[in-house]
Amino acid sequence: SSAASDVYKRQLHYGDVPAFTPERWDFTITGLVAHPQRWTYEQFSKLPHVTETYDIHCVTGWSKLDNTWEGVRVRDLLRPATVLPKGQFVMVHGDEDYTTNVPLSLLLQEGALIANKHNGEPLTPEHGWPYRLVVPGPYFWKSAKWVRGLELMETNERGFWERYGYHNDGDPWKEERYSWQER
């Protein structure tokens, strides 16, 4: 096994792994939308799932190339919600009050998924089961585990790690790791 795959097996999250109860799980789209959306786990798991392949980059310095993800396209989830013109930013909400912020434009990319499989296998609880956000481009902390909802917002408010000193954008090609690097 490669060093990158060994690193991927380590704990790379804050706090405990949330317990998953299918009857209590839901996924919502709220905020600056004309039609807020809510799916139960059963409903969400029946939505069309697609496969995308891209690299992931961790803020700690490692990358894992050619990852295949299976899940629901974020832009397909946003379509029935009808994002209002002022809703240009998204607060991604996960279990345990975890949040991360991304521009709406990143989630409208074809590759942005709410994923339940990685490299053909169901996600493990440690890696976000039953669903995690995966966004091609930024450092992987922006791809929130245990994702439960998207809140459309007018302003780019900071999420959990961004409030604790991580860069607001997290572009690995610009090495945007820390908030002190912001201009």
Where do the model's predicted regions map?
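Short, small-residue-biased leader/transition segments that mark boundaries at the very start
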Residues: 1-8
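Active-site scaffold segments
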Residues: 73, 113-117, 122-155
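Low-complexity, Gly/Ser/Thr/Pro-rich intrinsically disordered linker/tail segments
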Residues: 150-151, 156-183
